[in-house]
Amino acid sequence: MGSKSKILIIGGTGYIGKFIVEASVKEGHPTFALVRETTVSDPVKGKLVEKFQNLGVSLLYGDLYDHDSLVKAIKQVDVVISTVGFMQIADQTKIIAAIKEAGNVKRFFPSEFGNDVDHVNAVEPAKSVAFAVKANIRRAVEAEGIPYTYVASNCFNGYFLPTLVQPGATTPPRDKVIIPGDGNPKAIFNKEEDIGTYTIKAVDDPRTLNKILYLRPSNNIYSFNELVALWEKKIGKTLEKIYVPEEQILKDIQEAPIPINIFLGINHSVFVKGDHTNFEIEPSFGVEASELYPEVKYTTVEEYLDQFV
């Protein structure tokens, strides 16, 4: 291994971004974060930026919507990782244009970190808003011939497990649990820190070049029924189970306002259609993170749930 790539994270103060920034530093990469001047004075994000600086992250001032600042930032690094949020996914064409102009980027990771958007059976509006928009970015990256890795990290633990995906809940269920569909399709759950670690491990790895990196650690693959059974075992109590048939879920999606209909649609794709696990990873397009990096001690779902008991 030569020297470690210099990494720029765009969207580093966001939900998954901060974990990737921290993992990059931890793995010994010269780490850069693109931040807006206004972010530094923001009461919440400003503290995060300060934390980054204390870790040794270099701040580069710029903006997704300021082409020259993007090019200038990108010219200083080898690898660009985008973790921009939901509303800015489509605007990553601006990053693609800047990477193209800069001409020095060895790898681009667009903002993915969810389902593999080329293997989804989603209904509208999630189909377009959550998935197609990311697939369009993939096609744009490929059309420009930019070297890439797409990270399909499936479910963020922090979004799904503290409530066991119960609508409107803030804690896991103690009496009854609502289960979408028949509860049998398998989904995959990963802790955010582990997503950061696996993403950074892939940066200089030739095996992940122009591939989808799937996070499918064997101990984190659960059907909804298995997840509920694990939780029942932990709390020593049997819960009343309410199964919601797919027809009802589809009706709920049609009737719910934005953005609830999008989240319901993502849940439908994951827990009813089984879009995390209903296809095999072919070597032609993908690799699996826990196989590539067996040295990573990832947090299992079982360990993660202990904090809520």
Curated annotation (Swiss-Prot):
Site positions for Confers substrate specificity: F86, I89
Keywords tagged on the record: NADP, Nucleotide-binding, Oxidoreductase, Phenylpropanoid metabolism
Keyword Nucleotide-binding found: yes
Pathway: Aromatic compound metabolism; phenylpropanoid biosynthesis
Active site: K134
Catalyzed reaction equations: eugenol + a carboxylate + NADP(+) = a coniferyl ester + NADPH; eugenol + acetate + NADP(+) = (E)-coniferyl acetate + NADPH
SUPFAM superfamilies registered for this protein in UniProt: NAD(P)-binding Rossmann-fold domains
Record InterPro entries: NAD(P)-bd_dom_sf, NmrA-like, NmrA-type/Isoflavone_red_sf, PCBER-like
One Pfam family from the record: NmrA
UniProt site positions, description: Required for activity: I266
Its EC number(s): 1.1.1.318
Effect annotated for changing I89Y: Confers some isoeugenol synthase activity
Any one GO biological process: phenylpropanoid biosynthetic process
Tissues where this protein is expressed: Mostly expressed in petals, and, to a lower extent, in sepals, stamens and pistils.
GO MF, one example: oxidoreductase activity
Residues engaged in binding NADP(+): 13-16, 35-45, 86-88, 111-113, 134, 154-156
Family: Belongs to the NmrA-type oxidoreductase family.
Function summary: Catalyzes the synthesis of the phenylpropene eugenol from coniferyl acetate. Phenylpropenes are produced by plants as defense compounds with antimicrobial and antianimal properties, or as floral attractants of pollinators.
Protein name per UniProt: Eugenol synthase 2
The organism of origin for this protein: Clarkia breweri (Fairy fans)
